[in-house]
A protein has these predicted regions:
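A conserved, well-ordered hydrophobic junction motif at loop->secondary-structure transitions
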Residues: 41-65
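Hydrophobic residues in beta-strands and at strand termini
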Residues: 44-46, 91, 139
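Beta-strand secondary-structure signal
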Residues: 41-43, 88, 102-104, 118-120, ...
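HotDog/MaoC-like acyl-thioester-processing domains
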Residues: 1-9, 95-97, 108-158
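Hydrophobic core residues within well-ordered beta-strands of beta-rich domains
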Residues: 29, 83-85, 101, 117, ...
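Non-catalytic linker/capping segments at the edges of enzyme domains
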Residues: 1-48, 149, 154
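Hydrophobic beta-strand-centered segment that forms part of the acyl-chain substrate-binding groove
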Residues: 69-104
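Short, surface-exposed charged micro-motifs
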Residues: 30-32, 90, 106
């Protein structure tokens, strides 16, 4: 597994402050990502500030984590930016919060049709799938990704 370098680091003065992945956002999730073969993975500890119910991770935060790992799949595997156009989620079991919980978010590109990518995402705790989703992303042209979204390519650490 190789760590993915955040391509937006250094763009804070141009507006980069993503709730999910900006390491400097004081309210954010501060997610980091790894490439694991064909998959993109993030390991994240959901602290108690992200509860929906007592010691239970809020469903909207789960959706955010899934959407973000899908976006990073687009960035790393397809080398562009995109936007979510469809999101179907299934909550199978609650995800606990707390310092001793490590959540694995895993995204896999199922299919690409022209400018659309269909991505399967799972959230697991201790190897047990808690939430799963199918996401559809519209993938921007490389030119638009560069010009409008400051995309400079997405690389891994050596």
């Amino acid at each position: 597994m190789k760590k993915i370098i955040n391509p937006w680091i250094g763009l804070e003065n141009e507006g980069y402050n993503c709730f999910a992945c900006a390491p400097h956002n004081p309210c954010g999730l501060k997610m980091e990502f790894w490439e694991d073969g064909d998959d993109i993975v993030s390991y994240w500890t959901p602290n108690d500030n992200f509860q929906g119910w007592i010691k239970t991770l809020h469903g909207g935060i789960q959706a955010t984590v899934m959407d973000e790992v899908g976006a990073w799949l687009i960035a790393r595997k397809l080398q562009t930016s995109g936007m979510t156009t469809n999101f179907n989620i299934r909550y199978r079991r609650p995800i606990p919060t707390g310092e001793n919980v490590t959540l694995e978010a895993r995204a896999h590109l199922r299919e690409q049709k022209k400018m659309f990518a269909i991505i399967d995402v799972t959230l697991s705790v201790k190897g047990r799938v808690c939430t799963e989703a199918e996401l559809t992303y519209y993938c921007f042209s490389k030119e638009k990704a560069i010009e409008e979204f400051k995309f400079r390519g997405c690389n891994i650490e050596e």
